[in-house]
């Protein structure tokens, strides 16, 4: 557990890229909660939102008083993190906005190829510590990998319709289940690594544009970071794909310990 997948790009992956086999997939920049509903306010106290000015770019997950996990493809030159938010149109009592001090992508993440979703994970170090409480608190990292069929919660401010985009004002939640690795690989042949996990539902509940970097939480433990999926979103046979946290716990903890 905690050992990341190998970094090397296999020759067959390069062949697939050359042949255009990645067409129809999207790395959701900023990725929605389809077939969900408004979350109970502050029921996801670890939920973070990444902003450039007033523009929402991605979700994130608070994992320490100065640390947020998100997707590596969400990295920007200058941006901030909002915590304790529910409605994006009004200021919530626990809401706090903190500037990003450092963005640390996984060392194996491939910035040069936007269609390579491997190792899509990044730690953000905040300039100041968050004020923690019942409505703003870190989530626990999963010690074990998720089980097939396990029920999980996804959340975000991403679009609630696809392919047409319609962004909600409030945080949305939906329930999904963990898919087997075989089912995941059948949905996306040749594109799933051991550092990814799929989750979805028969009604099409899914993450989408605006949700990238947000949490997949199962039994109160962080099991995934929203990474990529099909376009349009919400196809039951094409589940959302998440960076599998249990494969990166060693890197996460080591990175945080070395910079605290």
UniProtKB/Swiss-Prot annotation:
**Which residues constitute the catalytic centre?**
73, 120, 212
Annotated EC: 3.4.21.118
Q: Where is the Peptidase S1 domain?
A: 33-257
Q: How, per the record, is this protein's activity regulated? A: Strongly inhibited by diisopropyl fluorophosphate, leupeptin and (4-amidinophenyl)methanesulfonyl 1-fluoride.
* Gene Ontology BP, a term: memory
Query: Where does the record place it?
Result: Secreted; Cytoplasm
Question: Tissue range of expression?
Answer: Expressed in the limbic system of mouse brain and is localized at highest concentration in pyramidal neurons of the hippocampal CA1-3 subfields. Also detected in spinal cord gray matter and in keratinized stratified epithelia of epidermis, hair, tongue, palate, nasal cavity, pharynges, esophagus and forestomach. In skin and mucus membranes, expressed in stratum spinosum and stratum granulosum. Expressed during estrus in vaginal epithelial cells but not stromal cells. Within the vaginal epithelium, expressed in prickle cells, granular cells and parakeratotic cells but not in basal cells.
Alphabetized, the UniProt keywords read: Cytoplasm, Disulfide bond, Glycoprotein, Hydrolase, Protease, Secreted, Serine protease, Signal, Zymogen
Q: What is this protein called?
A: Kallikrein-8
Q: What is the lineage of its organism?
A: Eukaryota, Metazoa, Chordata, Craniata, Vertebrata
């Amino acid at each position: 557990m905690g050992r990341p997948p190998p970094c090397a790009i296999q020759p067959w992956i390069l062949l697939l890229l050359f042949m255009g086999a990645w067409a129809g997939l999207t790395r959701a920049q900023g990725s929605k909660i389809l077939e969900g509903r408004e979350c109970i306010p502050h029921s996801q106290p670890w939920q973070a939102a990444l902003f450039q000015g007033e523009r929402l770019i991605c979700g994130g997950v608070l994992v320490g008083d100065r640390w947020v996990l998100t997707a590596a493809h969400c990295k920007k030159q200058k941006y901030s993190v909002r915590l304790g938010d529910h409605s994006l149109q009004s200021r919530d009592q626990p809401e706090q906005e903190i500037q990003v001090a450092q963005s640390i992508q996984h060392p194996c993440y491939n910035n040069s190829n936007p269609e390579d979703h491997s190792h899509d994970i990044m730690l953000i170090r905040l300039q100041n510590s968050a004020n923690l409480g019942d409505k703003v608190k870190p989530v626990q990292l999963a010690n074990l990998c998720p089980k097939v069929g396990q029920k999980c919660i996804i959340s975000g401010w991403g679009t609630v319709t696809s392919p047409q985009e319609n962004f909600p004002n409030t945080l949305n939640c939906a329930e999904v289940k963990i898919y087997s690795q075989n089912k995941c690989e059948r949905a996306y042949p040749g594109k799933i690594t051991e550092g990814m996990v799929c989750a979805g539902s028969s009604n099409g509940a899914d993450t989408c544009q605006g949700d990238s970097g947000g949490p997949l939480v199962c039994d109160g433990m962080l099991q995934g970071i929203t990474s990529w999926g099909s376009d349009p979103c919400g196809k039951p046979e094409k589940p959302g794909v998440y960076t599998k946290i249990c494969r990166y716990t060693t890197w996460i903890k080591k990175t945080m310990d070395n910079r605290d």
